[in-house]
């Protein structure tokens, strides 16, 4: 994805002081280095941070409120054309948040989307992240 110059953002409603250590630990476990070198923007719940720093640009509400994804797209990733955005989610709240933001959703099986009856809000459902490469 990075080789194709596609921007990647991470949006989590988890509070920055809890979410960031978990994200960093996952990257270390997978020998992936610093998440800031992978993601072009990371938005979390919590206090305002500087652009390029871990955390939030100032998220005001958690999912399913659309702010987290609109903030990620327009402020974090500097998107100018919303038709170039696609969201990937495994949670019902995330699907609603993306749809409220006006972005299409690819649902990742394994979360609670199907159990919540929200499959119909996803433009596509996949079992593994690798399947996303065929979509983009």
Walk through the language-model features, giving the residues of each.
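Conserved beta-strand/loop elements of the cytosolic catalytic core of P-type E1-E2 ATPases, chiefly
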Residues: 11-12
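Asp-based, Mg2+/Mn2+-dependent phosphohydrolase catalytic module
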Residues: 15-136
